[in-house]
């Protein structure tokens, strides 16, 4: 039996040009996501070691041999958080993805991770962000662990630009896909599931990048 663990990453709101920010601007010291270095397809994904809402530490190296899916997440974003029917968590898209991934016959597990890097965006401490995430997790039934990236260092390392911004990493720790959760016009077209299936089949992931959409990300 395979097990799917989940971790969600909430990275603030920097976004594609089509989506406006819905939260208070971050301090002037914050850096816009567009200027950050980016993790590269076909190369090792940046290592991370982050704690979830229960204080448990999770490292990318813990999941060697497993396909890892990262979702950048923000509790106040209408596309990834708890506001409105367009949220991938409110409209059931994430649960549907996780359900479909349970049927992926792979040698290892599929690990779904949520990462929240919204401290600069929301002007809150890591502790306050954890509290808000815990309340929302319970309220809307988020199944995945939420990891707190309090200093936004992991968001910078990955070049996460929006919430949601998805990253799919294979069992060797190589980044195989990043970008949109699904097609903006056809929500049934899920690029993350396509990437996971391709990795399972030993195939090249195509496409390996689709422009992400959602709320924007800001860094400290």
Locations of the language-model features?
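Structural micro-motif
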Residues: 142-145, 160-167
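Bacterial N-terminal signal peptides
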Residues: 8-17
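Bacterial N-terminal signal peptides that target proteins for export
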Residues: 1-8
């Amino acid at each position: 039996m395979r097990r799917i663990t989940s971790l969600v990453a909430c990275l603030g709101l920097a976004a594609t040009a089509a989506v406006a920010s819905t939260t208070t601007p971050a301090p002037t010291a914050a850096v816009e996501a567009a200027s950050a270095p980016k993790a590269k397809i076909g190369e090792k994904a940046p290592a991370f070691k982050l704690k979830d809402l229960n204080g448990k530490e999770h490292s990318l190296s813990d999941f060697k041999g497993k396909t890892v899916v990262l979702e950048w997440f923000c509790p106040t974003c209408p596309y990834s958080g708890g506001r409105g029917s367009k949220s991938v968590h409110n409209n059931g898209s994430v649960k549907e993805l996780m359900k479909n991934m349970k049927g992926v016959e792979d040698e290892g597990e599929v690990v779904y991770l949520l990462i929240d890097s919204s401290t600069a965006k929301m002007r809150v401490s890591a502790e306050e962000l954890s509290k808000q995430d815990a309340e929302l997790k319970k309220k809307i039934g988020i199944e995945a662990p939420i990891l707190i990236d309090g200093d936004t260092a992991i968001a910078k390392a990955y070049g996460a630009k929006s919430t949601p911004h998805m990253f799919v990493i294979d069992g060797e720790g190589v980044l195989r896909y990043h970008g949109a959760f699904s097609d903006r016009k056809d929500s049934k077209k899920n690029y993350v599931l396509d990437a996971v299936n391709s990795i399972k089949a030993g195939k090249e992931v195509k496409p390996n990048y689709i422009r992400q959409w959602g709320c924007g990300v800001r860094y400290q």
